């Protein structure tokens, strides 16, 4: 029996999706634009292992051209690009669709840039959480709003409420002055109160520091998601006696549904070390599922092109270590959940095609084309683990 190791490079899109114009994202290309930026600055992106596994070819399949500094090479894995069927370009939609369940309904959104949340909801939150007030109530970058309101938050003990183009209600609070457990309790109550609004996630955003220029978000972020609308590959594997090891924020994204073991870790090195530890002990018939969040939160949303490039190069250096821990029957999958082009306007996600790079001793190298849904990965995993087929998605041929 096989094991699958799925690493989600959160936000690593490889070219604008066919419907990107509906999202204002036509022309977005996270990988391509990072490569172009580094090439123009005389420091071409160095990703030999990702290239070996088919990244450059998947990008060419997605866009019709090689990224700057990349060219045709012999690949040692199966590669494809995939479009998203789900209605949104958010984290839960992307991950659920990867596991076979596209989101065909429309999420609720708080669309007003200022005074974003309904007064009735805010009043309910203050009462239920025994709060005297709040700050924010707007669309904002998570780091910028700390600079603007962090000191006032410490003085007042009012939590900071904010949102974005995603279906989210985010709450920032100081770990010491407000309290981490108190923040989690507030988020749990808000999660219950916003059910009528069909919001995908409430996110706890704890931070530390004592003034505007040194506030820093911590690794104690917690996402409060709704359950996927249907059973995912995770459920099917568990039901058949298999094991799902969720690393990083994966368990939060699926609201714990279908997760056998949740491993908390942070930072690229910490998350990949946790993945290696899981690979050492995981039995056959196990899915090891890791989200590498920093690509998105630290570099994509913050439009930090250099930081994103460095993180990609660091990840690339990890790949031989991951591969050396694989058994002969293991399948490694490198993919993403949406784009977040650091060269793009604004701070939000971008609607993009994603890479699907599959490798292992039993995987035949080559082009698997342009896929019509992220759910093709879920169907592929069903076939790998000999599970009942998902309703959507077409399995990728591995050999």
UniProtKB/Swiss-Prot annotation:
Isomerase that catalyzes the conversion of deoxy-ribose 1-phosphate (dRib-1-P) and ribose 1-phosphate (Rib-1-P) to deoxy-ribose 5-phosphate (dRib-5-P) and ribose 5-phosphate (Rib-5-P), respectively. Belongs to the phosphopentomutase family. Mn(2+) 2 binds at residues 296, 301, 349. The gene is deoB. Its EC number is 5.4.2.7. Mn(2+) 1 binds at residues 10, 337-338. PANTHER family: PHOSPHOPENTOMUTASE. Binds 2 manganese ions. InterPro entries: Alkaline_phosphatase_core_sf (IPR017850), DeoB (IPR010045), Metalloenzyme (IPR006124), Phosphopentomutase_DeoB_cap_sf (IPR024052). The lineage of its organism: Bacteria, Pseudomonadati, Pseudomonadota, Gammaproteobacteria, Alteromonadales. GO terms for cellular component: cytosol. It catalyses: 2-deoxy-alpha-D-ribose 1-phosphate = 2-deoxy-D-ribose 5-phosphate; alpha-D-ribose 1-phosphate = D-ribose 5-phosphate. It is an enzyme of class 5 (isomerase). One of its GO terms (biological process) is 2-deoxyribose 1-phosphate catabolic process. Keywords: Cytoplasm, Isomerase, Manganese, Metal-binding. It is found in: Cytoplasm. This is Phosphopentomutase.
């Amino acid at each position: 029996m096989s094991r699958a190791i799925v690493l989600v490079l959160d936000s690593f899109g490889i070219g604008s999706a066919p419907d990107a114009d509906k999202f204002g994202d036509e022309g977005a290309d996270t990988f391509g634009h990072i490569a172009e930026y580094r090439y123009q600055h005389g420091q071409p992106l160095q990703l030999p292992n990702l290239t070996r596994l088919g990244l450059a070819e998947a990008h060419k399949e997605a866009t019709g051209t090689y990224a700057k500094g990349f060219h045709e090479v012999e690949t040692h894995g199966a590669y494809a690009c995939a479009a998203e069927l789900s209605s949104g370009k958010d984290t839960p939609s992307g991950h659920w669709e990867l596991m076979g369940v596209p989101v065909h309904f429309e999420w609720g959104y708080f669309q007003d840039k200022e005074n974003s949340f309904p007064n009735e909801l805010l009043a309910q939150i203050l009462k239920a959480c025994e709060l005297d007030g709040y700050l924010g109530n707007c669309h904002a970058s998570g780091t910028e709003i700390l600079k603007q309101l962090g000191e006032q938050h410490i003085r007042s003990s009012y939590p900071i409420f904010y949102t974005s183009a995603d279906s989210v209600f985010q709450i920032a609070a100081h770990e010491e002055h407000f309290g981490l457990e108190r923040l989690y309790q507030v988020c749990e109550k808000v999660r219950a109160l916003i059910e009528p609004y069909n919001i995908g996630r409430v996110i706890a955003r704890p931070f530390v520091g004592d003034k505007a220029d040194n506030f820093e978000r911590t690794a104690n972020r917690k996402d409060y998601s709704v359950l996927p609308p249907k059973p995912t590959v995770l459920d099917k594997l568990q039901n058949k006696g298999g094991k799902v090891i969720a690393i990083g924020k994966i368990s939060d994204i699926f609201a714990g549904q279908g997760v056998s073991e949740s491993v908390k870790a942070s930072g690229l090195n910490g998350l990949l070390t946790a993945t290696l530890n899981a690979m050492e002990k995981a039995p056959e018939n196990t899915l090891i599922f890791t989200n590498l969040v920093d690509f998105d939160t630290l570099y994509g949303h913050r439009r930090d092109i250099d930081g994103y490039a460095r993180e990609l190069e660091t990840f690339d250096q990890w790949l031989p270590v991951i591969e050396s821990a694989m058994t002969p029957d293991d399948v490694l999958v490198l993919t993403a959940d949406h784009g977040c082009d650091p060269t793009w306007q604004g701070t939000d996600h971008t609607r993009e095609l994603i890479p699907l790079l599959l490798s292992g001793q039993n995987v035949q190298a080559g082009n698997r084309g342009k896929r019509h849904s992220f759910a093709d990965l879920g169907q592929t995993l069903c076939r790998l683990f000999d599970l009942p087929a998902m309703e959507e998605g077409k399995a990728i041929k591995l050999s």
